Regions:
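Short, Lys/Arg-enriched N-terminal segments with co-localized hydrophobic residues
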Residues: 1-10
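Catalytic cores of nucleotide-sugar-dependent glycosyltransferases that transfer UDP/GDP/TDP-activated
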Residues: 11-280
């Protein structure tokens, strides 16, 4: 395409305008932080989506363990006060472009200024990722990037789906936004005390229902994501079939069978540039 020609220039602008916009929300991402396979996917998939013609970006927490060489390259985009239940918390957004991919980092020292990525699986962990989920949605109009698809991953970002449908549905800015939830490991679900419903999520008693967020008397973040996501994917077709059964379903096989028409299994690939034996 020769951009110097008027017609082709118009075509280029149209193609850019019509690009599918995807925001990949993850609790970890290479090359910044990694504890498991989610970081590999979050690091590789947005790059491939961009090569396929999409405008794919990533949002993750601004953890303290992120190396200084990356932190120094970030630019401050915005900051605001985030309402999380009765709490008012600072929320900053930092931005870094690396290898053609735009990364947004949600900054809050209280939640992410620790020496570790994940902590004990207690209420403080639930509060951290309830904050992260709410911050993702609140930051979208402020970063001037409203995606077509929010790609959520595991329980840490699954609650974005219920929050979007229950608290932002009436806002025209969010009306077109759709969610895809990828389940990497069904065993980890983000199960916390019922108090999260009112104190942090402000979702109210009607959502504490066995068909929605309630799970054995508690709030289940991943279950909420499964119920409210527009589409659900897993890391392989085999795993997608397995989690529909009681043996592999980790107590969520019933809700997954109810969403079976929205569920698909996609085999994970690898970033052959990053995992290249010739460079080892």
């Amino acid at each position: 395409m020769v951009l110097g020609q008027k017609g082709n220039l118009h075509m280029a602008k149209t193609e850019k305008k019509n690009k599918l916009k995807v925001l990949f929300a993850a609790s970890e991402c290479l090359p910044f932080v990694k504890t498991g396979g989610l970081a590999d996917v979050a690091g590789a998939l947005p790059k491939q989506l961009c090569r396929d013609g999409a405008d794919a970006r990533v949002v993750l927490p601004f953890y303290k363990p992120i190396k200084e060489k990356y932190r120094m390259q970030c630019k401050h985009v915005c900051d605001f006060i985030l309402r999380l239940g009765w709490r008012s918390q600072y929320c900053g957004v930092e931005q870094l472009t690396l290898e053609g991919i735009t990364y947004y980092f949600i900054d809050n020292e209280f939640y992410f200024g620790r020496d570790y990525i994940y902590g004990n699986f207690d209420s403080s962990e639930g509060e951290r990722f309830a904050y992260f989920s709410k911050a993702i949605l609140e930051s979208l109009p402020r970063i001037n990037f409203m995606p077509d698809v929010l790609h959520l991953n595991d329980w840490q970002t699954a609650m974005v789906g219920p929050l979007l449908k229950l608290q932002y549905a009436a806002d025209p800015a969010y009306a077109h936004l759709r969610t895809l939830l990828t389940i990497h490991n069904l065993r980890y679900q983000g199960i916390f005390d019922r108090g999260f419903m009112d104190e942090l999520l402000s979702l109210g008693a009607p959502c504490f229902d066995p068909n929605l967020l309630e799970f054995n008397g508690c709030v289940n973040f991943l279950k909420g994501g499964i119920v409210y996501a527009d589409r659900i994917s897993t890391v392989s077709p085999t795993y997608a079939r397995e989690i529909l059964t009681p043996y592999y379903g980790e107590g969520l096989d019933g809700v997954l069978r109810a969403r079976e028409n929205a569920l698909i299994g996609l085999i994970n690939g690898i970033d052959t540039a990053y995992f290249n034996p010739a460079d080892d």
